[in-house]
Amino acid sequence: MLYQIHEWQRSLLGPLSYFAEANARMLSAPGNPFAQFPGVPRLAAGNELVYRLGKEYEKPEFGIHVASAHDQEIAVIERVAMARPFCQLKRFKRFSDDPATIEKMKNDPVVLVVAPLSGHHATLLRDTVRTLLRDHKVYITDWVDARMVPASEGTFGLDDYVAYVEDFIRHIGAESLHVISVCQPTVPVLAAVSLMAARGEPTPRSLTMMGGPIDPRRSPTSVDNLATQQPLSWFKGNVIHTVPPNYPGRGREVYPGFLQHAGFIAMNPGRHMSSHWDFYQDLLRGDQEDAEAHRKFYDEYNAVLDMPARFYLDTIEKVFQQFLLPRGLWDVAGERVDPGAIRRSALLTIEGELDDISGLGQTEAAHDLCSSIPAKRRAHRVIEGAGHYGIFSGRRWRETVYPQVRDFIRQFDQPAKAAALVRRTGDAPAAA
């Protein structure tokens, strides 16, 4: 019923919001002779603020059409490499008319970025993707808003997430692949690769795990504490709701995006209020650069998706309440998850010093679990001054984190290239 009430509220506020947008555009239009009259700039700024606070935020586009690779500008086309009901595997295909750049790009490592299914869309990793395109062939998991998936497609739980990751790795080809998991998916990615290793399947050349809850018992944050302070029944009764009839997924049980968004705001309400006030002041001053930066940030931040109820509850129970992975007690579709089975994949873990979502040590715990990976094939980094988002987006990601990720991938990519050469020619490369 709460979801339906939210939809009614949205339908009532929608016309007011778009009326405010029209007023803001009219009052601030360059050709409007009254635009600079006393009080008019305040009216225009106030109307735009009302519009942005009340509008419906659609899923943003990645919008990566041009990028830089090997110091050259290249064209990028976004393609769907594999489609599943709850996720699209997307590839960002690079193109160049420079022969030298083409040759370099052919030899670039292949990277799969596994994005979180945790409220925001995969486009939150736009900066991650754009930066990786400099030196890599890039794929990403683009999770589908659960309210858009017909109930006839069935449920989707944590085990299904693991199975999806396995399928994507096989589709791309594990032997030449490097997997980067950001935040929440570090857990299912580690499970997927562990299961593949235990079965004797090829595993990715390297695993880079960034800011994820491998062992939430270490340095628990407010997010971790929330999951342990309430029983699973509380989450079932308070945050799980049914998709209303006006969506393709009508009747599906979900953790609604609007509730998740309320939770995001509640974590730092003062910061968001201050940001909106600053936006209003920027509009009054005519500071369009800062105002546009605010628009872009909140266009992404306010665009949320519904999570499948089963997946959300599985994550709460198995990851944050029972700690099944670090305790060695997690079974996926009847198979025990044993990270000790991973031997060939290199492992890099990255944590932000100031991360208030995944505390220090939680991601590093992967090294204790992956006991069969030799020490020379493992590395751990703590990024000074970085919060949760800083390890995969923004200046600190581009200037500090990315070079370390790139170098680690390059270090362990060469054996795959040598093996590929042997398969093509039948000859081993000459020793250096």
Give residue spans per PLM region:
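Short, surface-exposed "cap/lid" segments of acyl-processing enzymes
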Residues: 63-149
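Conserved alpha/beta-hydrolase "acid-adjacent" motif
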Residues: 356-362
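Alpha/beta-hydrolase-fold enzymes
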Residues: 1-45, 174, 192-310
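Conserved acidic catalytic loop of the alpha/beta-hydrolase fold
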Residues: 148-150, 160-177, 189-194
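Short beta-strand/loop motif that positions the catalytic acidic residue
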Residues: 342-343, 348-351, 355
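Active-site nucleophile elbow and catalytic-triad environment of alpha/beta-hydrolase enzymes
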Residues: 320-339
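Catalytic histidine-centered segment of alpha/beta-hydrolase-like enzymes
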Residues: 383-399
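Conserved alpha/beta-hydrolase "nucleophile elbow" surrounding the catalytic nucleophile
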Residues: 180-186, 352
